[in-house]
A protein has these predicted regions:
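Class II aminoacyl-tRNA synthetase catalytic cores and aaRS-like
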Residues: 1-582
Length: 582
């Protein structure tokens, strides 16, 4: 679209325009003086073009990052000056007129071209509008837009309706801490920002909508991690009526496989449907985590029963896990791995090496009776050249230690599969867990999940033995999504909440809409919600999720650019009946 500022965008200029006078606009990325002739690298959202300045007066007052418009003649570059790194690398614009549209009044806080690699994150976030001019940063946000557009197209093509749910809702006692919003009209009462559209999407199913989705903003007052942005995040939220766990799996596979195959870097391998399904119990045993990274070929085995027959006291009465590795490892490697293990809190890291003659070498060898060594070789699948590491503690800690050692071995021995996106489902999560401090029973995952075995299981089984129809999608060790078959039966819901310490009145008060709606013919329904930010982080090979969000908070949940959270006036506080206490 041509206007007073530009005739075309920079990516639209080509060798076909040689000899034409055109007007372009953008930002001054760089200025180079070659003695009598100067060059400006002009950047807009789409490309970079070289501007030739032969009249020195045109360059007066021109500085980096000014917004300018330039009119001039498109010329062919000398062949020896071609720049194959940019689309306009064979042409340049001989400037006849340069006009500053947006002045730079202050010294730039950093060099835009190198901000992503050399500038501290807090400085980048304070001046995010400058940081976003960096092409690598901008490309992440453009990529994000394309992925979200594709997700919408895909879901719509599969018969899902895109529906929006409220941002101001009621606080409820599950999940992370709520962000709460005081009411002006109702003294002492509060709204909450939704941690997820959980209740609303279930109510849509009760309302008779068959398949719903939205790119949902979610708000949780929780600490940041590399794969978790504090404050808010986005998820592809979807729900289906009259659906089973397997139906949700099929949709998840179709959507994620297609988006990763379309947007993953060239040459990447993406898991084909159907994805492997790993139970929570199996995941904790074989991978030491409920977020298994299947790119790592190492597996954990349980050798607890075997070591109860041995005389190694540190293993007696404990859960013992082991990892078999076939690789050459120096003394220095073992020392570094031991240091890593003790840094986790382990008292040591026992190991055995299998020698050429089939005998063992290592600090634990003497504690394994000779008549048991063949049994152990078969149990662990040991071969000549193998090394096997041992982790022993209470079951939960042993699993954690084994998982961390598995990850460290995979990384340090370069065993992780390259250019691959390995998906799996983790299912059969425990419905309930016991708080180690209070000893009270609570929900493990989602309180609205259907327990396996229904009401009979709730009435007859130990709560800690009950499994739920809950599931996660994991990719490369990152939890992309959680979901569940929902508990749509009032009797089952009341009993489940009773076990978790909530009486019927709490259920009515905190989840009143669901409680009431489920008395009017609620259909079976199920769904999940893959995280959009995490999806894009994986596709862009970024280590920090904030790199794929346009205006993220920093790790302390602060918006350094706009100054949130900030103080408000006494009048504003009075209007919402709030008094700040020291």
């Amino acid at each position: 679209m041509s206007n007073i500022y530009r005739d075309v965008t920079l990516n639209q200029v080509s060798e076909q325009d040689i000899g034409k006078t055109i007007r372009v606009a953008g930002w001054v990325e760089n200025i180079r003086d070659h003695g009598g002739v100067s060059f400006i690298d002009l950047r807009d959202m789409y490309a970079v073009m070289q501007i030739v300045i032969r009249d020195g007066k045109l360059l007066e007052g021109i500085r980096k990052e000014q917004a300018i418009t330039v009119e001039g003649l498109i010329e062919k570059r000398d062949e020896e000056t071609y720049n194959p790194k940019i689309p306009t690398g064979t042409i340049e614009l001989d400037a006849k007129e340069v006009t500053v549209l947006g002045e730079v009044y202050s010294q730039l806080p950093f060099e835009v071209m190198t901000s992503k690699s050399v500038v501290h994150e807090d400085v980048r976030l304070k001046y995010r509008y400058l940081d976003l001019r960096n092409q690598k940063v901008k490309d992440n946000i453009i990529f994000r837009s394309k992925v979200i557009s594709y997700l919408r197209e895909k879901m719509t093509s599969m018969g899902f309706l895109e529906l929006q749910t409220p941002i101001l809702c009621a606080s409820s006692p599950e999940g992370a801490r709520d962000y709460i919003v005081p009411s002006r009209k109702f003294k002492g009462k509060f709204y909450a920002l939704p941690q997820a559209p959980q209740q609303y999407k279930q109510l849509l199913m009760v309302s008779g909508f068959d398949k719903y989705f939205q790119i949902a903003p979610c708000f949780r007052d929780e600490d940041a991690r590399a794969d978790r942005s504090p404050g808010e995040f986005s998820q592809l939220d979807f729900e289906m009526s009259f659906a089973t766990q397997e139906d949700v799996f099929a949709v998840g596979e179709e959507v994620l496989s297609s988006v990763f195959e379309k947007f993953a870097p060239e040459g990447s391998v993406v898991t084909k449907a159907p994805y492997p399904i790993i139970s929570y119990k199996q995941a904790m045993l074989e991978f030491g985590s409920d977020k298994p990274d299947l790119r790592n070929p190492l597996r954990i085995i349980d050798v607890t029963d075997f070591f109860q027959k041995c005389t190694f006291k540190p293993f007696i009465g404990k859960t013992v896990r082991a990892i078999r590795v076939h690789a050459d490892m120096s003394k220095g490697f073992h020392e570094k791995l031991l240091k890593f293990a003790t840094g986790l809190g382990m008292g040591g890291l026992g190991y055995l090496e299998v020698l050429e003659d089939g005998s063992y070498k290592g600090p634990i060898d003497k504690f394994i009776p000779d008549d048991c060594k063949e049994e152990f070789r078969i149990l662990a699948g040991l071969e000549v050249g193998d090394t096997i590491f041992f982790m022993a503690d209470k079951e939960e800690r042993a699993a954690y230690y084994a998982g961390m050692i598995r990850n460290e071995l995979g990384e340090k021995l370069d065993l992780i599969e390259k250019n691959a996106y390995r998906f799996c489902y983790v299912n059969d999560f425990p419905m309930f867990e016991k708080d180690p401090e209070t000893k009270k029973i609570g929900f493990t995952h989602n309180p609205f999940s259907m327990p396996q075995g229904g009401l009979e299981a709730l009435n007859t089984m130990d709560p800690l033995d009950i499994l739920a129809y809950q599931y996660d999608i994991v990719c490369n060790g990152v939890e992309l999504s959680s979901g569940a078959v929902r508990n749509h039966d009032m009797q089952i819901m009341e009993k489940a909440f009773e076990i978790a310490g909530y009486d019927k009145e709490v259920l009515k008060n905190k989840f009143g809409a669901l409680y009431t709606a489920f008395q009017y013919g609620a259909p079976p329904h199920a769904g999940m919600a893959p995280g959009v930010d995490r999806m894009i982080m994986l596709l862009r090979n970024e280590e920090n999720i904030r790199e794929v969000i346009a205006f993220p908070m920093n790790g302390n949940a602060q918006d350094l650019m706009c100054g949130a959270p900030n103080e408000v006036t006494e009048q504003q506080l009075r209007e919402v009946h709030i008094k700040v206490r020291d």
